């Protein structure tokens, strides 16, 4: 006999690109997590949410531990600068770790980041900026997801090459398929050039997008630092507010919804099978 159990769940508002500090070389140890939470709840109608605090090339341990103490759904994240080609501008890429919010874990990650980025705000033409392979090798003992910027003129993956440069499409297609799980932007508008870039690489299907605010000031949330930033369109995730929930959603695009208002409740159906036989 088959039994189907329905579990009703709420869509999860996610923002995985929030800065705690204007200057990543001098982190703000007094970042106002409570203010951020209040602004998020005001925006999302007091719905469940998951966030990541992604400063440039470092992790604000103080802010993460404060957020953990508030019982928030958190993923450890960093906004990395990565070099695609020598003598070309670096691009920005988020890395999210499947790791507990603990002192020693964050210290271990920051130790690696300090080796990779002695200066947390390198010039985008800095030849010492690590490439994707160095990043992967450096964090090979951790479980992580990589999501590069898309659509934004500053730091987007598809702008990390020199004008007129003839790329090996096979190599870049391999980088995307093997290393990236999607990309980030403030909304779905302005993605034409990013999507066109993927098509030139032979990637014709739509690539999973996670929208994020790129906020620096919790009082002004969800505004970005840039006055030219496009309007923010929230992403709602139909999964548990965890790293694994994010990974699942990036593999099943139907689990990511883009809306300024909360989508309807969703349900997971768990099917069980009872075997009724006296010989079993």
Label each residue range with its predicted role:
Residues 40-57, 145-147:
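Divalent metal-dependent hydrolysis catalytic cores, especially in the metallo-beta-lactamase
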Residues 91, 97-139:
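Binuclear metal-dependent hydrolase catalytic cores centered on His/Asp/Glu-rich metal-binding motifs
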């Amino acid at each position: 006999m088959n039994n189907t159990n329905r579990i009703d769940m709420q869509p999860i508002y996610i923002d995985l690109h929030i800065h705690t500090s204007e200057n990543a070389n001098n982190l703000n140890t007094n970042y106002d997590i409570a203010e951020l939470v209040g602004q998020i709840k005001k925006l999302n109608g007091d719905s469940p949410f998951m966030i990541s605090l992604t400063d440039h090339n470092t992790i604000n341990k103080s802010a993460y531990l404060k957020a953990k103490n508030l019982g928030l759904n958190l993923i450890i994240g960093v906004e990395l600068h990565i070099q695609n080609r020598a003598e070309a501008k670096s691009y920005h890429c988020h890395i999210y770790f499947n790791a507990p919010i603990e002192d020693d874990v964050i210290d271990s990650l920051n130790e690696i980041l300090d080796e990779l980025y002695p200066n947390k705000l390198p010039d985008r033409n800095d030849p010492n900026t690590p490439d994707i392979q160095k990043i992967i090798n450096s964090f090979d003992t951790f479980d992580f997801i990589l999501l590069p910027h898309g659509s934004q003129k500053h730091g987007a993956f598809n702008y990390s090459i020199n004008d007129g440069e003839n790329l090996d499409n096979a190599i870049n297609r391999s980088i995307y398929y093997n290393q990236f799980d999607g990309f980030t932007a403030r909304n779905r508008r302005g993605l034409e050039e990013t999507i066109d870039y993927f098509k030139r690489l032979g990637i014709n299907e739509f690539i999973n997008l996670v929208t994020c605010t790129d906020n620096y000031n919790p009082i002004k949330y969800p505004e970005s630092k840039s006055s030219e930033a496009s309007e923010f369109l929230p992403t709602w995730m139909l999964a548990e507010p965890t790293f694994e929930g994010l990974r699942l959603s990036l593999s099943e695009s139907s689990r990511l919804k883009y809306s300024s208002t909360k989508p309807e409740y969703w349900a997971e159906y768990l099917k069980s099978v009872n075997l009724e036989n006296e010989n079993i």
